[in-house]
């Protein structure tokens, strides 16, 4: 049972970790415009930037049509929360006002069983970002990724239909494809089984004497998939209402605000940076949600860009929106943020940021109990695409902030794992966004 502080002392992009490559011997594989790996030479190929297609600004679209195997499970889950995990969840009490509350115990960030419970109750429910519409804007394009223990595959078939599947061959469970590109079919690298981009089994090699082998029953296991503006979302949740509005289901009442900032056809993808971190995914999320409490101490250049007197944090359902005006005294005279920066953190692990001529997305990918990866994608207004110096400097400044946060978050993780720390306090009102996130976690995990 949780105690109050007065009575107790003190979780583009393809997210596949493998290189951008084909899983079959077909020669029709083409790279997508979003790279898999961090490119230290930001503008080594200017033409690739200029050829990046527009962001999709169409309304949300849910695709449920798929060729599925009735004998291949969509997801293995447990219906009940183990008592040991339940007790950990309830060590945090959301009913205690944040001014008097303790933060969740360190075991929320260090216990492997708790992380497994998070995957099941948070990441395997509702909508999760898988990638971006431009990755599969053409027929026969695909990309892959992972979400916890789930390997997924998103494809657009020859008829233009969008699909998502478990990226697992139904024969002997080999991972079917990796990376991203363009194919007419998927060939399993293990025994050569062939699947269409609609998930159907086209060929089971050498299965001439196998009895009652029905290809219709051995297609790839489907996932729900939706397009919402520039984002592709997937869901493993069988109970999800396919007729509900995607934006509202994913974000809540802030969906229109996020849409107004993210659905901009004038934006082009420019660059991806990745930051592996030796910390629990929530450590980074907590850091992001502290209303820049840490910024003056940890990010000197970034702090000089902000007018902290204008900082505003608003919590609405599954989203925390932070807005801040820019300083009149720009560091180096470089105007990166424009007049105001907009940061929308969408639970559990995704952020949309608009400032100046930029949009960035921040995706915190859980990769283990004490490991995650931050994927930062940069979009830029078309008018600035020819200004290499502006692009290089803007990306370098933001990347440096993430490098500084990486050091902080990994330090926090090490501290959480020591016997010296159990719970902390909220500094109010500046850490109200963190408290709101913890309350949502408590509600979702119990």
Curated annotation (Swiss-Prot):
Domain Rieske: residue ranges: 127-234
Intracellular or extracellular location(s): Plastid, Chloroplast stroma
Cofactor(s) the protein needs: [2Fe-2S] cluster; Fe cation; Mg(2+)
Top-level taxon of origin: Eukaryota
Pathway(s) served: Amine and polyamine biosynthesis; betaine biosynthesis via choline pathway; betaine aldehyde from choline (monooxygenase route): step 1/1
Alphabetic keyword roster: 2Fe-2S, Chloroplast, Iron, Iron-sulfur, Magnesium, Metal-binding, Monooxygenase, Oxidoreductase, Plastid, Stress response, Transit peptide
Sites where the protein binds [2Fe-2S] cluster: 169, 171, 188, 191
Induction or repression: By salt and drought stress.
Targeting presequence: 1-65
GO biological process entries: glycine betaine biosynthetic process from choline
Family from the record: Belongs to the choline monooxygenase family.
Protein name: Choline monooxygenase, chloroplastic
